[in-house]
Regions:
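C-terminal motif of bacterial Sec signal peptides marking the signal peptidase cleavage site
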Residues: 19-23
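Extended ligand-binding regions for polar small-molecule ligands
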Residues: 25-27, 68-77, 158, 223-264
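Extracytoplasmic small-molecule ligand-binding "clamshell" domains
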Residues: 29-107
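Short helix-initiation/N-cap motifs at beta->coil->alpha
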Residues: 32, 84-95, 139, 157-158, ...
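Flexible hinge/capping segments at coil-to-helix
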Residues: 35-37, 133-151
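Short loop->beta-strand "edge-of-pocket" segments that line small-molecule binding or catalytic clefts
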Residues: 43-48, 143-157
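Beta->alpha turn/N-cap motifs
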Residues: 47-52, 85-90, 99, 103-111, ...
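Periplasmic-binding protein-like
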Residues: 126-133, 196, 200, 204-245, ...
Length: 270
């Protein structure tokens, strides 16, 4: 190699040093935790379904509800924007792990399956699974034992579906609980199994489903509780628990619950 070639090679090697150092610098600024990842990208992507009074759209198409409003406030506390993404409930863990969403915040029952596959917040609302029937037939089905032979609509992958299986009831799974109600209203299904919180807001006199009624509670003995789910191992769940505690202490959580009619189900945050 002549002197000029050696000089050119040396110059090229030196020119690569800053680029290599810059590459190392980028690795150092990578998110060190899930919470940092959310903050660095500047958005909290919330996985939801149409589920009043927790998550639903107003006349302008904006997402509102007890959970939706809490998610907005939590995102604001982190200094990020909130983005709502509708999901298929059966795919919630896959959506989290694939980072298409950051959190499932949608009146989610804290089952063993959920708590083993997600980093979950403390429980914040009590709930139960109830049967929804046409109002003119509700009196005929006052007990769980009387339900055999009915065709149920249930949300796929939901606690309602689990209750249908546990009780040996015939069912068809649908995309969400709102669709389950529509199936009963249209006569496609004899009954539905949905969350008691949704039933209280959506069914009966003064609602869009005045011709439907709430029937037996399927898990009255055990009940269930709602929690919020992040990716497995995420530190964002601990941050949300602290946010819940602060919101309880300030009274903001109780006021929001009263706004959406879920105050009786609210669990104290310590």
């Amino acid at each position: 190699m002549n002197r000029f070639a050696r000089f050119a090679a040396s110059a090229l090697a030196l020119s690569l040093v800053p680029a290599m150092l810059m590459g190392c610098g980028k690795k150092e600024t990578a998110a060190s935790s899930d919470l940092d990842y959310i903050k660095q990208k500047g958005t909290l992507v919330v996985g939801i379904t149409d589920f009043a009074p927790m998550d639903y759209q107003d006349a302008d198409g904006s997402w509102i509800g007890f959970d939706a409003d809490l998610a907005k406030a939590f995102a604001e506390s982190l200094g990020v924007e909130v983005q709502f993404q509708t999901i298929e409930w059966d795919n919630k863990v896959m959506e989290l792990d694939g980072k298409t969403i950051d959190v499932v915040w949608n009146g989610m029952t804290l089952t063993d399956e959920v708590t083993s596959s997600m980093a979950c917040s403390n429980a914040y609302c009590n709930n139960a699974q109830v049967v929804i029937l046409p109002a003119d037939k509700a009196a005929d089905y006052g007990t769980v034992d009387s339900l055999s032979g009915l065709r149920f609509a249930v949300e796929s992958g939901s606690a309602g579906m689990a209750q249908a299986e546990e009780k040996g009831l015939m069912y068809t799974d649908v995309v969400d609980q709102a669709t389950a109600l529509l199936e009963v209203k249209s006569g496609t299904a004899d009954a539905a199994i949905i969350d008691s919180l949704m039933a209280g807001a959506m069914v009966g006199e003064g609602t869009n489903y005045a011709d439907l009624a709430i029937g037996p509670v399927l898990n009255a003995e055990t009940g269930e509780q709602y929690g919020v789910g992040f990716r497995k191992g995420s530190d964002a769940a601990a941050a949300l628990n602290e946010f819940f505690r602060q919101q309880w202490e300030s009274g903001a959580l109780q006021a929001l619950a009263e706004q959406y009619g879920v105050q009786a189900a609210l669990i104290e945050q310590k």
